């Protein structure tokens, strides 16, 4: 039983890899768009409640089941940038991520989970990187974007990731000492990367 936190450069294959790892392990997979929607609902439902530290697990599960695959790209294409400066949202996001970690058997993608869960036992922190050409090629191949659209989306995603993490977390997200494993998908196939993560889960016995 484990929680896997995947941080990645957009286009390095994090969502595809995270889904595959979760499927093989029988874990739930929760990406940025889902985490933001859970946090927004928590903030809306309990905006001033100091006594509500965590969502009930059943409620989290119900909300997760209502979120579809479109929520992932919506995070990069349609999200209101003002969300990134709201400390209330970060507080709710922090609580949601910690509650999901308590539920165990979860793969989390992004939103600072590598920082939020740094001292949480049983959490494996993975970083995916790739060069820009490989990331653009992946977006074209995986989502059918034109080269221009893929390049524009990559630039926007990198800017959002950098701004969010610099606002709320004190360390560089690509600092390798934060992670149990760093995988470069320029050189590694996603299938090989998945195998390495599964082997790490098994060897660490978490």
PLM regions: where:
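Small-molecule kinase domains that catalyze NTP-dependent phosphoryl transfer to phosphate-bearing small molecules
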Residues: 57-67, 72, 146-190
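Pre-Walker A (Motif I) flank of P-loop NTPase domains
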Residues: 1-4, 8, 104
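ATP-dependent small-molecule kinase phosphotransfer cores
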Residues: 39-105
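Conserved phosphate-donor/acceptor-positioning beta-strand/loop module used by diverse small-molecule
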Residues: 119-142, 147-157
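Long, contiguous binding/interaction regions
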Residues: 111, 127-132, 145-146, 156, ...
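Glycine-rich phosphate-binding P-loop
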Residues: 5-19
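Short beta-strand-centered segment that lines the nucleotide-binding/catalytic pocket of NTP-utilizing
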Residues: 28-40
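RNA pseudouridine synthases
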Residues: 100, 112-119, 138
């Amino acid at each position: 039983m484990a929680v896997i936190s995947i941080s990645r450069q957009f286009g390095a294959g994090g969502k595809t890899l995270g889904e595959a790892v979760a499927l093989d392990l029988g874990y739930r997979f929760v990406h940025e768009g889902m985490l933001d929607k859970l946090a927004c609902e928590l903030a809306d439902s309990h905006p001033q409640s100091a006594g509500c530290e965590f969502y009930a697990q059943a409620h989290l599960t119900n909300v997760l089941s209502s979120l579809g695959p479109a929520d992932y790209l919506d995070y990069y294409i349609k999200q209101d940038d003002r969300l990134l400066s709201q400390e209330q949202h970060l507080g709710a996001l922090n609580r949601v991520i910690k509650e999901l970690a308590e539920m165990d058997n979860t793969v989390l993608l992004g939103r600072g989970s590598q920082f939020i869960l740094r001292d949480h036992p049983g959490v494996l922190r993975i970083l995916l990187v790739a060069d820009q050409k490989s990331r653009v090629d992946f977006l074209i191949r995986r989502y059918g974007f034109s080269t221009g659209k893929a390049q524009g989306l990559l630039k926007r995603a990198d800017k959002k990731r950098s701004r969010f993490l610099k606002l709320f977390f004190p360390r560089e997200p690509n600092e390798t000492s934060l992670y149990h494993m760093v995988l470069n998908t320029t050189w590694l196939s996603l299938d090989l990367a998945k195998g390495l993560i599964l082997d790490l889960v098994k060897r660490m016995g978490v």
